[in-house]
Amino acid sequence: RFTAEFDFRTYDAEGVILYAESLDNTAWILLALRDGKIEIQFKNEFGTKVTSGGKAINDGLWHIISVEELEHSISVKIAKEAVMSINSPGTLFKQSQGFLETKVYIAGLPRKVGNALVKQINPRLDGCIRAWNLMNQGHSGVKEVIQEKQSKHCLVAVERGSFYPGTGMAKFQINYNNLDSAEDWLINVTMTIRPSTDTGVMFALVSNETVPLALSIVDSNSSDSQKIIVTIGSITVAQLESKKLCTPRKVLVGLLVTKQQLELSVDSHTDRSNTEQLSTLHQAMMANVVTYLGGLPDVPLGATLVTAFYNGCMEVKVNNRQLDLDEAISKHNDIRSHSCPLIMQ
């Protein structure tokens, strides 16, 4: 019979923890998180079922989760206490010559499966799993795979936020148009940052091979401060110096742009500009722009001043909407959407 037990920690509200299927794909079980609560979906020869229950567990604390197939039901426990018992006629997976063989996927789904689920889910999950015991065989099989992949190792202590390791970016399609007027648009970005290195692109708009707007952190001449700059193409249109950006404290950065004016704020300091370069940005906004967080795609040399990937923690709101990296069109695998390394002070 199918059994799985492990310790689990996350701040993420939705995603796939584990998916197992029979070798011929006729039966499967999905263990997932939705609205922070455990959800089970399964299919066998008798039909399909979806059930969720228990309290929300996306609180960043460790929880012991177990799923066990019993004679006529599937039992789900959190911290050894039953939170769900799902009636299940027949066994989940049929034995073959006395053996139970299943394919198990952790923190994701095989490509073809998404549409076959009883209830659709965003599979991306940022969490940590330890103390594996699959099919009562301990962590054999799982441990070897994880040990070889540095990016799959858990951080010891985490807090809420998103972590960019300096190796990639996330891509979004965002509509900046102001509904009142076709010619009007608004870019209102607020972010909380805790950089780990002194140079990198935090937020950028890309139009074809140009970068009509970028918000970056760059090293300054002074040893204990960095600059936060706004560029249109390769021209700096606003900048502010900030002392000791790469420290445990979080810094609040704001960028407000209309076709008439641009305003950059860092903590309580502000730099305003109504440069003629805004007409370049306006032309791009009238066409099509793609939003990037944490870096840039390949653009021609000289298209912009900073091309390095951002390294550190960052949470971003665009036009008052918190961006969820799980909803990005694409995102580098090493970016952690919902957890940041905790700095011990």
Model-flagged regions — what are they?
Residues R1-Q345:
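Non-catalytic extracellular/lumenal binding modules and the flexible linkers that connect them
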